[in-house]
Amino acid sequence: MANLRIEVISLFPEMFSAISEYGITSRAVKQGLLQLTCWNPRDYTTDRHHTVDDRPFGGGPGMVMKIKPLEDALAQAKAAAGEKAKVIYLSPQGRQLKQAGVRELANEEALILIAGRYEGIDERFIEAHVDEEWSIGDYVLSGGELPAMVLIDAVTRLLPGALGHADSAEEDSFTDGLLDCPHYTRPEVYADQRVPDVLLSGNHAHIRRWRLQQSLGRTYERRADLLESRSLSGEEKKLLEEYILARDDS
């Protein structure tokens, strides 16, 4: 049995091959950690043109996705995933997806993601069937497929066994409320730039402190807003103070 089952309702299910066939998410699918199924509302239309959209009442540009094909696709998705599956609509009006929210969603047994198109979907469908709306940022995309894939990728990384190293997810940016530290690989010197000596020292305590200090410093410089909502330990305060002093002296 999969750790997480995700059903996606989309007019472009082929796009989700990027999830099922490549990278970490593909490995999770093959290992049975993630089960991903797509449902196309066009398959639940009854007219010869497979119509899934219509003009908006009140006029205006664009088209709106119709209720009935979405409802029928959702019924099939719920039959597969179970009635308790959380129904999520990817929408600019939704709660912004951050790492804390990703952790919440990773604890669900099943998710049903609705990827809208055109000007959106009929509001009555949202009111009747959607549990939560989520957004990946304050900008406009052509549809909900890319946000759905972002959500799936982020959630999959937190599934036990999905990553090659047990600590990888815990060391990602934002997991501890901080940006990630710099990373280096061979060669030790490239274009006269050396890898920091501490990373070559073999002293794991010093390496841990250096990485934590770099994470704190980067967050302070690039996303200070993250520090406002995070309580720093005594060690973290000291490391950040040292980082700022060293930067100002250089």
Swiss-Prot record:
Subcellular location: Cytoplasm
EC number in record: 2.1.1.228
Record key words, sorted: Cytoplasm, Methyltransferase, S-adenosyl-L-methionine, Transferase, tRNA processing
Binding site for S-adenosyl-L-methionine: 116, 136-141
GO-annotated cellular components: cytosol
Key word tRNA processing present: yes
PANTHER family noted in UniProt: TRNA (GUANINE-N(1)-)-METHYLTRANSFERASE
Pfam family, one: tRNA_m1G_MT
Family listed: Belongs to the RNA methyltransferase TrmD family.
Subcellular location, principal: cytoplasm
Purpose: Specifically methylates guanosine-37 in various tRNAs.
GO molecular function (one): tRNA (guanine(37)-N1)-methyltransferase activity
The protein's name in its UniProt record: tRNA (guanine-N(1)-)-methyltransferase
Known catalytic reactions: guanosine(37) in tRNA + S-adenosyl-L-methionine = N(1)-methylguanosine(37) in tRNA + S-adenosyl-L-homocysteine + H(+)
